């Protein structure tokens, strides 16, 4: 309820700085302190992520990254982040952008370029994947306000999610500290829990789009729009059941390998999201696209956000896992 009330006070974000100000305000109110995955309240964590997504997907992108960074630092038993710090979590590894680290005493020196660093211009710290001298992946925490860090204006041309400022950052002899050991980022159980958290964000955006259609059908119950609403309800209801079940499984076995669970959940939520975009867009017509700024922004943002999935590549990975499962796993 506190989060819902807080978000009601914010309407519209002109740019990255406005998103950063809202994220800072959330942090100052303690609303960034989400239950950790596997703590027994994983569904509450997913619910809050979905709430922020339904409010504004661009703010959610920064909020999810900040809260994910806090969870990772806690999971890897590293020192608590500085009081009042705001974090970005950047783990994209396209072939053209790579950060290297080398040891310098108790700290690390960073060199290279990191792609798609959402909120880089407005966060105080970044948690990012880099590669050490033995070509092992290493998580590194970096203070952003130092001479060796340059936040560029390059790397993002999409209209959707533009205000997230997901630009490239260049590191030139920047200082950082290791978070965990090499390989820990992907090896920890929370990696897959975080992937389901992103799916909860997709869910929140899709749910908000569906509410626009529900409101329209309540005022004008036109048969074709009602058919679209029925399809949307079916998809959302199924997706909600999947997220609730996933949260329960994480809480029951927080240290278990959750890769299969995450791949299944993300595939389900992605499919639902695409169905909602399709049905809502066809049902509401041009009016909301042209006259409802929140709806128009969501319709621009959600297809971009959901592309954090790797589409058929992820489905192929899921199929490979399922092919190795014993028969009978689909029985009730």
Tell what function each PLM region has.
Residues 6, 11-16, 20-24, 238-270, ...:
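C-terminal helix-coil-helix/basic helical segment that borders enzyme active sites and/or dimer interfaces
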Residues 204, 230-237, 263, 267-274, ...:
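Generic structural signal for well-ordered, non-transmembrane alpha-helical segments
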Residues 113-146:
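DPxDG-like acidic metal-binding loop motif
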Residues 226-231, 256-264, 293-296:
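Short, charged, amphipathic alpha-helical segments
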Residues 110-112, 140, 171, 206, ...:
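Buried hydrophobic positions in well-ordered alpha/beta secondary-structure cores of metabolic enzymes
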Residues 287-332:
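Glycine-rich phosphate/cofactor-binding loops in nucleotide/flavin-utilizing enzymes
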Residues 157-238:
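Glycine-rich beta->alpha junctions and the first turn(s) of the following alpha-helix
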Residues 11-122, 323:
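Glycine-rich flavin
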């Amino acid at each position: 309820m506190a989060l819902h009330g807080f978000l009601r006070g914010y309407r519209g974000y002109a740019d990255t700085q406005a998103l950063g100000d809202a994220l800072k305000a959330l942090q100052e109110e303690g609303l960034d302190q989400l239950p950790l995955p596997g703590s027994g309240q994983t569904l509450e964590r997913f619910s809050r992520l979905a709430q922020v997504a339904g409010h504004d997907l661009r703010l959610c992108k920064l909020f999810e990254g900040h809260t994910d960074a806090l969870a990772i630092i806690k999971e890897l038993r590293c020192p608590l982040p500085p009081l009042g710090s705001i974090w970005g979590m950047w783990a994209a590894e396209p072939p053209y952008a790579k950060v290297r680290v080398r040891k310098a005493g108790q700290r690390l020196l960073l060199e290279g370029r990191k792609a798609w660093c959402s909120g880089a211009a407005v966060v105080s710290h970044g948690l990012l994947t880099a590669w050490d001298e033995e070509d092992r992946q290493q998580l590194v925490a970096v203070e952003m306000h130092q001479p060796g860090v340059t936040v560029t204006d390059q790397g993002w041309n999409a209209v959707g999610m533009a205000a997230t400022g997901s630009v490239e950052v260049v590191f030139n002899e920047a200082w950082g500290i290791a978070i965990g050991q090499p390989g820990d980022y992907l090896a920890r159980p929370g990696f897959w829990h975080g992937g389901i958290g992103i799916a909860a964000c997709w869910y929140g955006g899709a749910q908000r789009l569906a509410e626009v259609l529900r409101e329209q059908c309540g005022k004008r119950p036109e048969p074709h729009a009602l058919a679209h609403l029925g399809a949307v309800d079916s998809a959302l209801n199924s997706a909600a059941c999947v997220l609730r079940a996933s949260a329960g499984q994480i809480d029951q076995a927080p240290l278990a390998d959750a890769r299969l669970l995450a791949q299944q959940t993300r595939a389900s939520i992605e499919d639902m999201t695409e169905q909602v975009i399709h049905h809502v867009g066809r049902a509401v017509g041009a009016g909301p696209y042209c006259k409802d700024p929140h709806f128009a922004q969501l319709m621009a943002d959600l297809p971009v956000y959901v592309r954090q999935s790797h589409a058929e590549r992820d489905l192929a990975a899921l199929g490979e896992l399922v092919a190795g499962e014993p028969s009978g796993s689909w029985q009730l």
